[in-house]
């Protein structure tokens, strides 16, 4: 299953919860979940039957995958890697997802969504420890410095995004220097650091069935 390239607002409606895939629009009255809080399609407003246990786990898996915007293959590979590591599988899995460069760029406020962050990375606007990295799935390590590339510092999009970050706080596992257009990945986030509308235990059960 490849990466979804259609209207992202449909994904929120399909999962029945805001996934915050479109930046500021998700916080405005224009958000599709505010205007049409039911699944897309001609039968979306009909009362749904009680879902099976499998369907509940599938929806939770899809919800988490769509939040991070990655393909099923990438998602499954990260899960399998997490399941082989020491620690609580769910927390380790979320840590791997949060360590992706596109996600860190989004968390630092260089981009308003993970989709936009992927574009910035792919187009060479981001450096890690002073070296340009154009792979969104690049694994960021604790202590790494993530910055806007020198040639990209006058891009209006990035400047506007960082201007909006003034007065805001990034997650406690990150540090941000707005004026310097750079930040640091201090550590892997703890589960309580992440305000994700997901029960990762159901995702584990889905893949462990």
Swiss-Prot record:
Keyword Protease in annotation: no
Cited InterPro entries: Ribosomal_uS4, Ribosomal_uS4_bac-type, Ribosomal_uS4_CS, Ribosomal_uS4_N, S4_RNA-bd, S4_RNA-bd_sf
Cofactor: Zn(2+); [4Fe-4S] cluster
Domain S4 RNA-binding residue range list: 99-161
Gene Ontology biological-process annotations: ribosomal small subunit biogenesis; translation
Keywords recorded for this protein, A-Z: Metal-binding, Ribonucleoprotein, Ribosomal protein, RNA-binding, rRNA-binding, Zinc
Positions bound to Zn(2+): 9, 12, 26, 31
GO molecular function: metal ion binding; rRNA binding; structural constituent of ribosome
One term under GO cellular component: small ribosomal subunit
Cofactor note: Binds 1 zinc ion per subunit. In a number of structures (e.g. 4Y4O, 5FDV) a 4Fe-4S cluster is seen in place of the zinc cofactor.
Coiled coil: none
Primary role: One of the primary rRNA binding proteins, it binds directly to 16S rRNA where it helps nucleate assembly of the body and platform of the 30S subunit. Binds mRNA in the 70S ribosome, positioning it for translation.
Protein family per UniProt: Belongs to the universal ribosomal protein uS4 family.
Subunit annotation: Part of the 30S ribosomal subunit. Contacts protein S5. The interaction surface between S4 and S5 is involved in control of translational fidelity.
Name of this protein: Small ribosomal subunit protein uS4
Species this protein is from: Thermus thermophilus (strain ATCC 27634 / DSM 579 / HB8)
């Amino acid at each position: 299953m490849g990466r979804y390239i259609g209207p992202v607002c449909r994904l929120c409606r399909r999962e029945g919860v805001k996934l915050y895939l479109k930046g500021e629009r998700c916080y405005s009255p224009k958000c599709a979940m505010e205007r049409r809080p039911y699944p897309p399609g001609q039968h979306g407003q009909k009362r749904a039957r009680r879902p099976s246990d499998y369907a509940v786990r599938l929806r939770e898996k899809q919800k988490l995958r769509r939040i991070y915007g990655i393909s099923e293959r990438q998602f499954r590979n990260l899960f399998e890697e997490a399941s082989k590591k020491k620690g609580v599988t769910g927390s380790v899995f979320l840590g791997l997802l949060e360590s992706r460069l596109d996600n860190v760029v989004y968390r630092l406020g260089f981009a308003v969504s993970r989709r936009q962050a992927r574009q910035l990375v792919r187009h060479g606007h981001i450096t890690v420890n002073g070296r340009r990295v154009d792979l969104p799935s690049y694994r960021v390590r604790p202590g790494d410095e993530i910055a806007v590339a020198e040639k990209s510092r006058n891009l209006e999009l990035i400047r506007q995004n960082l201007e909006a970050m003034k007065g805001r706080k990034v997650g406690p596992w990150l540090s941000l220097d707005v004026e310097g257009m750079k930040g640091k990945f201090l550590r892997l986030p703890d589960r309580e650091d992440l305000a994700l509308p997901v029960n990762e235990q159901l995702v584990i059960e889905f893949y462990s069935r």
